[in-house]
């Protein structure tokens, strides 16, 4: 896959999965039922922690033989839960968010990057 193909995939993902500002994400988390998914690799999370109450499902797992029960167990049959995805800066999360939409999840938003969340004082859990 060349750089042009990657840019097209990213543009398509960004067109379908809205990216939230810190304020928008914080408001949604405090007012709406959410499932927060960190798609960074485990080594990244070990170094920085993860957003409070987030679960980790690395993009590498989502891209290969993904078992949807990892998400469905957290949804508790509640289709109204909003799924927020994030990574380090928002690129992988856009791609994963788009995949989740294509897989049938209805409410998927890109929280963006952990670095923005942390620099704005967002709540973080260490592991």
Name these PLM-found stretches.
Residues 86:
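Short, surface-exposed ligand- or partner-binding patches at beta-edge/loop junctions that are enriched
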Residues 1-34, 42-82, 91-127:
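Rhodanese-like catalytic fold shared by cysteine-dependent sulfurtransferases
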